[in-house]
A protein has these predicted regions:
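Short amphipathic alpha-helix segments
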Residues: 13-28
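Surface-exposed beta-strand edges and their flanking turn/coil or helix-capping segments
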Residues: 19-22, 32-33, 59-62, 71
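Hydrophobic alpha-helical segments
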Residues: 22-24, 37, 65-66
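Amphipathic, hydrophobic secondary-structure cores in small proteins
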Residues: 29-59
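Short glycine-/aliphatic-rich beta-strand segments at the starts of folded cytosolic domains
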Residues: 1-11
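C-terminal structural segments of small proteins and small subunits
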Residues: 53-79
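Low-complexity, flexible helical/coil segments
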Residues: 6-7, 40-46, 71-74
Length: 79
């Protein structure tokens, strides 16, 4: 069974910085998950494909945490 998830993050500012900060995470290869990340204008689009629910949950926890931290760091930089 293949499980697919797609998330769109509309980012007002810093979209390019956030996108580029997350790109190195795609270099790591995993046996049961595959991820893609793209930037369309100011929207970050994350696609995750997993072989099972446990793998999907783990991958999403990691990716969502990374996106959240990147957004927080970008907003702190503006202060």
């Amino acid at each position: 069974m293949i499980i697919l998830a797609e998330f769109e993050f509309p980012l007002a500012t810093g979209s390019r910085i956030i996108y580029e900060s997350l790109l190195p995470e795609l270099e790591e290869e995993y046996q049961r998950t595959r991820s893609t990340l793209r930037l369309e204008q100011d929207t970050l689009i994350l696609n995750v494909e997993a072989d099972d629910l446990v793998s999907m949950r783990a991958a999403l926890n990691g990716w969502l945490r990374l996106v959240k931290i990147s957004c927080e760091m970008t907003s702190m930089h503006k202060l």
